[in-house]
Amino acid sequence: MAPKNKFTKEEMVAAALQVVRTKGIEGLTAKTMADALGTSTQPIFTAFGSMDIVRQEVCAAAVRVYDRYTNAGLQEKIPFFGVGMQYIRFAREEPELYRLLFLTRAQGQGWSAMQSMKHLQTLVRPTLMEIYQITELEADLYFRDLWFVVHSLSTLIVTGDCPYSDQEIGQVLTGVSISIYKSIKEITGFAAGTFDRDAAFRALVGKGPRVQEDD
């Protein structure tokens, strides 16, 4: 009869998650997990059977951590902006979990950055339509394009190549947000992709540079 494990599966997954936080998913082995638990590797294989199963459980746990961030964003006064800033916060505070979920092929979880975007898109769509008075198609395009920028900035943060503060990032997102919204409102067919691109740019170029007034 095999000895009873003194750790629950939940405790083991929590230890594995902590290993990933410090060493990345590549650093998660039976030995590093056992070291974190202060035990041998035998209880790990008794509970899970293989490290592949452990990695799947860690991915699911990482998703739950990520969900706490996005849920906090959804509670903000402007949910779609809150979600974007929480996505960036997740990248800053949990870089290895971000790397696991969004920069690594999912470990059998069917999870990816694009799937995350589509899920969030569904959640914020009603608010976008109500606040900005736009159609479902326009709301989806608005969030998708803004999310591309959010994801790019978050990836720069995780790879250690983002020189911008949260305040500067907020300014970038505001500028992109205004640009997308203005295009949706003023360029016929923008959301559907049927607008005349050349004509749109000619109209902008024809306005010439803006002259800044002296104070």
What are these regions (language model features)?
Residues 11, 15, 19-53, 57:
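Helix-turn-helix
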Residues 20, 52-62, 101, 105, ...:
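Alpha-helical DNA-contacting segments of helix-turn-helix folds
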Residues 56-83, 119-131:
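Amphipathic alpha-helical linker/stalk segments
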Residues 77-96, 140, 144, 174, ...:
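Amphipathic alpha-helical segments that line or abut small-molecule/effector binding pockets
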Residues 81-103, 110-117, 147-154:
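Helical hydrophobic small-molecule/effector-binding pocket
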Residues 108-133, 140-145, 151, 155, ...:
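Amphipathic alpha-helical packing segments from all-alpha helical-bundle domains
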Residues 126-130, 163-215:
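C-terminal peripheral helix-coil segments that are non-catalytic and often amphipathic
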